Amino acid sequence: MHNKRYSMIVIALAAVAAMIVATQQPIAAQAPQGGGQKGGGAKGGGFGGGAAKGGAAKGVPAAPLPTQPTAVALPTLSAKITGPGAIYDSAVSQWPGRDVKFYKYDTDEYFVSGTANGKPYKTRLVIRRPADNARFSGLVLSEAMHPAGNAHAFEYTSVYLMSSGHIAAEILTGTSAVPLAANKERYADLTLSNDQTNEILAQVGALIRSKTGPLADVTVRKQVLFGTSASSAILTNYLPAHMVYRTPEMQHIYDGFMPTSNGSVIMAVDVPLIQVPTQHEQENIATNRQDGDAAGDQYRNYEFAGMGHLDSRNNGPRLPQSACVNPLSNYPLEAYMSVALYHLLRWVDQGIVPPRADRILIDRNRNNDGSLMALDEHGNAKGGIRNPYVDMPVAKYTARNTAAPTNGNALLCGLSVYTTAIPKAELKKMYGSKSNYVKKVDARLKELEKAGWSLPVYHDLILADAKAVDF
């Protein structure tokens, strides 16, 4: 009964999160803010989860922002939480065989208490860090936990993140229903509300950088905030607060931002921001904001051909094949989200300006796959950042899978990509032999790695997909 109730809560929250994203409404707006470059409302975006015009969600009182840069109060950090019972695991979808144990990472949980919007709060903070401090890179990837209870920023970059020695921080900013349903005794005292979100993100982010926080034994050089889908709405809603909230030393709390699975037009900020719309966001034209390098407009838009709104490759615990009618895509979303994170971290930490990329081409013809994308002869997107899955294709990648008639999941299937295999006879005409195909993929990977569009840490993992193709 407990597990059934927990599953129902997760499904309900996921549905709420999807509705928020689909309608471009803010999850936790505390002050009027715009999604546009000049502070206007969000435009376009499909399922991107950007800020909607008007700021505060109906019924949620806005907390007015300071008019000048203001230091936030540091909240109180608990000792490491070790019980009762097991920690709620928000990162169940890591690359098989490449989890925290493989990379010798520790997962530490804390409770954080403070005051936000005039009310006390107590929330959860999870730190995933190298067991050996000497491996820490000095860089922290922080995220607001997705409303459905997922640490997607960590999951979607975990191989790159852990192989590089970065630390991942996960901050609970909204409802505690998911961890509470998983372990009532452990999480019974958590108390927070959506109208406290921005201040919680600021206060806990400042705590992470401080010498009284969970990383007091190491030196944090830079910290970025990542969001995907509904949690990217949390991120974009935070941006006006970013412009005024500071650490007690009056430094930036977050040095860069990465909203993903998000196609809205996002306001300009004073630190680098890389946005990653997916093929789902091309059902409506994704943001037309242009890349920029100048101070106050450090922006990149990275659109990866073949990428879906949701990872369906390593998401078996949440989205098994049996839930959807069509074959789930094996496209390695993580490998390419990590490319964007790699460039963002170099930008904020070393000042290395990232390359600009072509956008996915648009023909406004919905009679092909229902999107506005221009498609090649195999049915895959033209333009965008390329990869072997679309350059040496063995399948067509189409957004919006269909839920299975029995025990299906309409929400997650609809947010995933499915594949249609290219017939083996056609593959033989295209590549001649399997060995020749593998050589082509290997050569293409090396080209992309040299150009900065694929990371060497994923080379063998991607090449293994090519070696598994049979024709």
Outline where the language-model segments fall.
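Signal peptide processing junction and immediate N-terminal pro/mature segment
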Residues: 20-33
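C-terminal His-loop and adjacent cap/lid subdomain of alpha/beta-hydrolase
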Residues: 31-471
